[in-house]
């Protein structure tokens, strides 16, 4: 009876212990607790999830604004802002465009630049950018977080953090990167160091913050860093 009562108490206490795992590793049998990250939490770490059929652009933009500029915005906030100057009927059928994103960013005092770049210069992109890709026949906007020699890391508003082979990424990418520029950019933001895929043992390259000179080459100005 005593054991059954103890089990019942542990079950009732379960919700308050969610996300933690007890580890008996201390001398004398003391218990410590370690935060446990679910597969879903890891998949969408640092990303804004897409909630509607037409809002991948808004979710991708909100991800960059939250993580790289520490702005308190979510997908709904960005959608409302972009709809002010967008064709709402066109948005419902085709989604937002990069022009809609550009107008929204300018309305909040930021800048946007679109660059057409080739595969050979992909490694020169040192900031998180919005890109349009086709994955499994589905075209939508994602955040390109980081490019390496053989891999490209993306933050997909629907699928979460993904690592694509360079060839797979290039096959679905239209060659354009959309950069968000402005004051308060965090040069060590989390998007530049995406989660290691669950199937990978280690990363090939360690994260290194980008210097001012590299950022200015991409469109930032000196006052953005103060």
UniProtKB/Swiss-Prot annotation:
GO terms under biological process: proteolysis
Result of knocking out the encoding gene: Deletion of just fapD in an overexpressing strain yields cells without amyloid fibrils. Deletion of the entire fapA-fapF six-gene locus shows no visible growth phenotype.
Subcellular location: Periplasm
Active-site annotation: 56
Residue stretches spanning the membrane: none
EC number: 3.4.22.-
Ligase is among the record's keywords: no
All residue ranges annotated as the Peptidase C39 domain in the record: 50-180
Keyword Signal set for record: yes
GO cellular component: membrane; periplasmic space
Residues in the signal sequence: 1-18
Function text: Probable cysteine protease that is involved in processing fibril precursors. Upon overexpression of the endogenous six-gene locus (fapA-fapF) in situ, cells form large clumps during liquid growth, make large amounts of biofilm and produce amyloid fibrils. Expression of the 6 gene operon in E.coli strain BL21(DE3) induces flocculation and biofilm formation with copious extracellular fibrils.
Family: Belongs to the FapD family.
Protein name (record): Probable functional amyloid protease FapD
């Amino acid at each position: 009876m005593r054991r059954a009562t103890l089990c019942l108490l542990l079950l009732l206490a379960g919700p308050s212990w969610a996300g933690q795992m007890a580890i008996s590793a201390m001398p004398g049998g003391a218990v410590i607790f370690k935060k446990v990250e679910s597969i879903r939490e890891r998949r969408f770490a640092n990303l804004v999830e897409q909630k509607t059929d037409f809002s991948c652009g808004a979710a991708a933009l909100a991800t960059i604004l939250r993580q790289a500029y520490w702005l308190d915005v979510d997908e709904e906030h960005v959608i409302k802002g972009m709809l002010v100057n967008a064709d709402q009927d066109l948005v419902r059928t085709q989604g937002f465009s990069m022009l809609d994103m550009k107008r929204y960013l300018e309305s909040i005092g930021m800048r946007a630049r679109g660059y057409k770049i080739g595969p050979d210069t992909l490694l020169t992109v040192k900031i998180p950018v919005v890109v349009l890709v086709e994955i499994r026949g589905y075209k939508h906007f994602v955040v390109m977080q980081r490019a390496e020699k053989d891999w490209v890391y993306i933050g997909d508003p629907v699928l979460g953090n993904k690592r694509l082979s360079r060839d797979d990424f290039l096959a679905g990418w239209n060659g354009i990167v959309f950069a968000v520029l402005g004051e308060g950019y965090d040069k060590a933001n989390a998007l530049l160091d995406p989660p290691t895929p669950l199937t990978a043992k280690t990363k090939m390259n360690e994260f290194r913050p980008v210097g001012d000179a590299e950022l200015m080459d991409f469109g930032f100005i000196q006052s953005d860093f103060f």
